[in-house]
């Protein structure tokens, strides 16, 4: 789960991370009133969307008067902001965060993430923070600093000293950086986050370190332990089909292809998407119905897939372990009769009650294309949509 910048800063401040402060606006009619509450020489108007690249896309504006701030805010509120992370459709700006500006002497990059390949927590930092951090990582990777933390031992003093040293901080600034490292680590662990990113982390004119922007991503599996964080969820920022799927107990991620996939198990789903690509097409989604799906969940899964107007065909690939193939077959037939599946449908079943499932499908009278293995299934669905 992602949250907005202003929410991320609120959490970080609770853990002792110094951040820039401001006021959030969620209604157009509140813009002028909110800006009037700020007494500053420089105003920073920031679009609040769950995507990076706002600065380059015009979603962050710095102005020097209340009148300018009000005009910029009114112009920005409600627009579709297109960044390199939103895709061409953009993301509607339903919230603004208006801050007091500050002098910036130097920008840094600082984050903490799960390094799945190394099975540890990793700090990533750079002396080259700001809007071009992606270019820095690509063109000058030597400027990216990494420190790994063993989960068994946790954060140690040498991690904090090392990060401060590598970033070039000395004396009081080194002390501040060590405290920020510790605070961010504690926030990461205690909130079940998967990423906390501060970009930029700045040194202001007073020589103090300040988080000027912040992003936090949480592990969905840990949200039940954090109702206060769950309450921060902004459904307007999420794909409506993904939200609908989550409410039905399905793992769904929309993609850019034209072949809908319904699979049980994340690994099998990934393999299914890979083989679709191998045969010359592209998957329209990742959809894992899980090991304990019933007839209604299968039916809802197919409805969600067909809600995507880009879908030209569907591949169902089920390995029946806990899941029974006859249940899948009944769900497919129920969905087909309820909503009408007008695109080619290829079904590959294997495992528990596979013979019964195949019999149910063959006797249904529906135009379902059976497949004997994964390669056969991929070949048939790709050929069917051509």
From Swiss-Prot:
- Annotated catalysed reactions: succinate + ATP + CoA = succinyl-CoA + ADP + phosphate; GTP + succinate + CoA = succinyl-CoA + GDP + phosphate
> What cofactor does this chain's UniProt record say it requires?
Mg(2+)
Kindly state what the record says about how the cofactor is bound.
Answer: Binds 1 Mg(2+) ion per subunit.
Residues binding Mg(2+), per UniProt: 199, 213
Enzyme Commission no: 6.2.1.5
Which pathway does the protein contribute to?
Carbohydrate metabolism; tricarboxylic acid cycle; succinate from succinyl-CoA (ligase route): step 1/1
Quaternary structure and interacting proteins, as annotated: Heterotetramer of two alpha and two beta subunits.
Q: What is this protein called?
A: Succinate--CoA ligase [ADP-forming] subunit beta
Gene field: sucC
